[in-house]
Amino acid sequence: MKELEECLEALLAEVKPIEKTEYVALTDACDRILGEDIVAQMMIPPYPKSAMDGYAVRAEDTSGADREHPVTLQIVGELFAGDCAEIPYEEGCAVRVMTGSYVPEGYDAVIRQEDTDYGEKQVQIYREITAGTNYCCVGEDIREGEQILARGTHLRALHMGLLASLGIYKVPVCERIKCSILSTGSELMAPGTPLLPGKIYNSIAYMLRASMERQGIQVPFTEICRDDKELLKEKIQQCLKTADIVITTGGVSVGKKDLLPEVLEELGAKKIFSHANIQPGTPTIGSVLDGKAILSLSGNPYAAYANFEYYFWELAAYLTQDASLKVRRTQAVLSDPYPKVNKLRRFVRAYAEEGRVTLPTAVHASSVLSNMRDCNCFIDMEPGRELHPGDEVKIQYFK
């Protein structure tokens, strides 16, 4: 049996990142992945502006000024933020300005009003300043032609402000990936319908769908398919038409109605791995058809969810080139004993907080869903190991 890392690496080698781009409104671009480099088409600021409320001056006109020997300048105009008027420079003159307002040509500094007598027709300057003081040059923040953001950037709120400052409203972003879910098994029924004898409700698809949509992944197709080989083929092909990734659940083991291995083979899918060194979820299958990954998971809820968490997010991160989709792996100190020793590597459901990890008290079975409700991670347990309180263990947080 292959190690999980080997299985994942082999699957990633068979698919290519999705490079389709679409344009969305700036108001819809946050949390998307930038599809193109952004190059500034203008200077920021686009005009010389004041960084303070005060008086625009020629710095040399303040030479020698202090509170004992103030310099008096004549006020020849007043500009507020949003005004743009050329007021020619005259020696010994100043223009009243506010923070963000235009500074006319010929003036090269702004004396803050606290260093003056707040004069209205003429102003006394109490401090000598140098050129550039409280003065923002054209392009001081951003130069025209400068690359501002690189393709692949995960856009955050601060990026929205940056794009808006450049006047950009339509933003090129990578198309969101789509993942369809096909739940197989004649025993499955959809929630909201009366449960018939011998049937169970389909729970796995709703866990997976919620997890994906929470991260912005579209799920165009979620359906149940009974154990019928020809119908399974039809449904998988239908999924491939609208999705970049297909997830199936159930039918991957060796029972008479476990049809997925045969169905995938007859469809011409290239099997990348099966029967990895892991419990639960040993019979998980990774395959590729029409250049798209198909991840076939166990029909047991925890087995399906744990292996989904391990494989899917790394696959999604690779296809989108979005590192934020990668899972968080770290180490923690175990609080509870886990005496069960396994021949295979094992994913043990758990709850981690502040560097410590605890185990649920209920039965640890791949078909048991109820004791997952308080879990936020699994322990990645090496084969042949018995866990004791105080042991340091590897964990992977759920997305």
Spell out what each predicted region is:
Residues 11, 54, 145, 181, ...:
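Residue-level signal for inorganic ion chemistry
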